């Protein structure tokens, strides 16, 4: 959740670190800080609040001259968000500065041991324990590398660490366990970061650190050591993302830009995967025999990716004619899941670093299941540890609220269902062909929706004044309702809940009163009559209803509801792919009307790398 940037080279470090932290703002944070080694020694500057406060404090970095440094944006887990608790944290003697993403679970015990040894603490953070323990180990052995090893051997929990020592001012040390960290390679300069977006303007050649590894970074090169501290050579990944894709490009917000990028993102996700009317997934290493022998299928994800999994369940069950389970990753890892050899676990994650999803992946592999990752970030932890990986090719997604990652994950799941169904012989030719044709025209239909947003903007104006909103839907529309509700609550701060329409009578309808906004998602035409009945039901209690439906459904609903937002006709299983766009726009324009911080909603982070 926190952002880490490190630099060693010939340039002034502080301005470069500030730029990198700016590109990590989307991850969420409540304070920021820098530590730089220069002629004046090791100096640290920190500030609570937005990054602008740190930029002003350091005069854009000019107050911290030096060519080696680390920077950090903190999301508070231990101690309130203030200057003292911000990172970098330092040892009492001022010799070490540490930035940290993760949670040190045994920090309280370590802190008490250090206090008994005479250490004094200033902050409430677990990270200061790392810095103080490191200084104590250094005092015992006199060697920075060995001190880091001794310190790491005593830590329990998760960490991505960047370490700067005044006694070795030409280098950084990095270490990782269950939290993302990568190394960037330049010419006469090298980098450290928690996210590749921080480095795109400086290098495209990166190495992703694995758990237990330690790296020593100098201007001349990077030495990487495995868990047993043996030197290792690791594969370099070249990042092809467009630098401009991580810029707003004239849009008011990243979220709006990314909404409008969805047609092209879906085109990229499909390119090369449909040939002559057939789905071809050459990315997969699974043989036809292995596909036919798949036992249970379980989709594991968090947040919006979980909602994608719910849609994927319908697609896979329809195509494969076998049950599919969808689990929240945070529950799966603790549920003693009934999976084993021959079963397939599909892990979905935009970042490929979500901690709960990583833990679920490892639990699945420990039990003998095969793991297929669906991720956006090339070379991420989930991509590396999965048996197979399908990339979504959505490109950088900066806004906290996901948009194009959601739609590309969904189209990849559709392609997977078609491919497996074809191999297994469980999908009929008519359905297969119709789905393929539908996927091929999806980008154009998405562009059609994005060209006509007047009704959505009008609905957002009246929705913006509300404090409670309900979404209802059945079947695929229920899964879509969950995503629409999540989008609205996370960026507009309106209390929003989604319910399966058939459950209204089981308690929820008691919350409907005069003027209550209800968004009825009714794109699934086989159940349109049921949707109309539910609309009548809530209107009888005074609800104000906005219906999201197809062009055909609009004819049945437009005289019954307060407003209708239509989407083009397509195959039923593809409708969530189109229906989500008006819901994304509705959330965006509602939040805009309310003056919310759309790209960086309060209390939220883009990549959740702690429990």
Predicted regions and their residues:
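Conserved short alpha-helical segments that host acidic/polar catalytic motifs at enzyme active sites
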Residues: 1-253, 264-298, 334, 429, ...
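Hydrophobic alpha-helical scaffolding
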Residues: 7-10, 100, 120, 137-141, ...
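Glycine-rich oxoanion-binding loops at beta->alpha junctions
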Residues: 67, 71-84, 275-289, 312-348, ...
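Generic C-terminus detector
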Residues: 229, 544, 570-611
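Active-site phosphate/pyrophosphate-binding segments
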Residues: 262-266, 270-298, 388-517, 591-611
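Glycine-rich phosphate-binding loops that contact phosphosugars or nucleotide phosphates
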Residues: 292-434, 438-441, 521-526, 530-565, ...
């Amino acid at each position: 959740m926190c952002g880490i940037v490190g630099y060693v080279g010939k340039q002034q470090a502080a301005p470069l670190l500030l730029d990198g932290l700016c590109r990590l703002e989307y991850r969420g944070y409540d304070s920021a800080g820098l530590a730089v080694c220069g002629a004046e020694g090791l100096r640290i500057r920190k500030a609570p609040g937005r990054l602008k406060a740190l930029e002003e404090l350091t005069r854009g970095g000019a107050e911290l001259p030096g060519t080696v440094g680390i920077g950090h944006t903190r999301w508070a887990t231990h101690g309130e968000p203030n200057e003292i608790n911000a990172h970098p944290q330092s040892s009492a003697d001022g010799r070490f500065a540490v930035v940290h993403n993760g949670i040190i679970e045994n920090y309280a015990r370590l802190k008490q041991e250090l206090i008994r040894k005479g250490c004094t603490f200033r902050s409430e953070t677990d990270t200061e324990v790392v810095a103080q323990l490191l200084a104590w180990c250094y005092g015992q052995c006199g060697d920075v590398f060995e001190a880091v090893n001794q310190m790491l051997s005593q830590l329990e929990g998760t960490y991505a660490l960047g370490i700067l020592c005044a006694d070795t001012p030409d280098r950084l040390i990095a270490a990782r366990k269950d939290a993302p960290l990568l190394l960037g390679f330049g010419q006469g300069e090298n980098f450290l970061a928690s996210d590749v977006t921080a480095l795109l303007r400086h290098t495209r050649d990166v190495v992703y650190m694995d758990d237990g590894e330690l790296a020593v970074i100098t201007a001349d090169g990077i030495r990487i050591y495995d868990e047993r501290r043996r030197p290792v050579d690791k594969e370099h990944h070249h990042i092809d993302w467009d630098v401009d894709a991580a810029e707003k490009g004239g849009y008011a917000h990243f979220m709006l830009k990314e909404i409008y990028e969805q047609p092209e993102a879906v085109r990229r996700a499909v390119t090369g995967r449909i040939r002559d009317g057939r789905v071809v997934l050459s990315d997969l290493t699974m043989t036809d025999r292995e596909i036919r022998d798949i036992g249970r299928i379980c989709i594991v994800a968090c947040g919006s990716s979980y909602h994608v999994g719910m849609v994927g369940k319908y697609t896979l069950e329809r195509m494969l004619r076998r049950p599919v389970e969808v689990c929240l990753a945070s529950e799966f890892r603790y549920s003693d899941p009934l999976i084993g050899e021959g079963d397939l676990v599909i892990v979905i994650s935009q970042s490929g670093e979500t901690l709960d999803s990583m833990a679920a992946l490892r639990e699945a592999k420990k039990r003998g299941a095969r793991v297929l990752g669906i991720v956006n970030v090339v070379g991420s932890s989930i991509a590396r540890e999965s048996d197979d990986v399908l990339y979504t090719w959505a490109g950088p997604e900066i806004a906290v609220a996901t948009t194009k990652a959601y739609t590309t994950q969904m189209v990849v799941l559709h392609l997977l269902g078609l491919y497996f169904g074809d191999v297994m012989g469980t999908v009929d030719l008519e359905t297969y062909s119709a789905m393929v044709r539908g996927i091929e025209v999806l980008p154009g239909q998405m562009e059609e929706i994005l060209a006509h947003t007047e009704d959505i903007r009008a609905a957002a104006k009246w929705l913006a004044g509300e404090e409670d909103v309900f979404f209802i839907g059945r079947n695929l529309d229920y899964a879509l309702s969950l995503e629409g509700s999540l989008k609205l609550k996370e960026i507009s701060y309106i209390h929003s809940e989604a319910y399966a329409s058939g459950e209204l009578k089981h308690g929820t309808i008691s919350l409907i009163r005069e003027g209550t906004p209800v968004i009825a998602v009714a794109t699934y035409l086989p159940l349109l009559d049921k949707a109309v009945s539910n609309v009548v039901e809530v209107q009888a209690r005074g609800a104000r209803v906005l219906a999201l439906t197809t062009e055909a459904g609009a004819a049945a609903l437009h005289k019954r509801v307060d407003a209708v937002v239509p989407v083009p006709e397509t195959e039923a299983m593809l409708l969530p792919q189109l229906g989500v766009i008006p819901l994304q726009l509705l959330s965006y324009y509602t939040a805009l009307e309310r003056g919310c911080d759309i790209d960086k909603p309060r209390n939220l982070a883009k990549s959740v790398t702690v429990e």
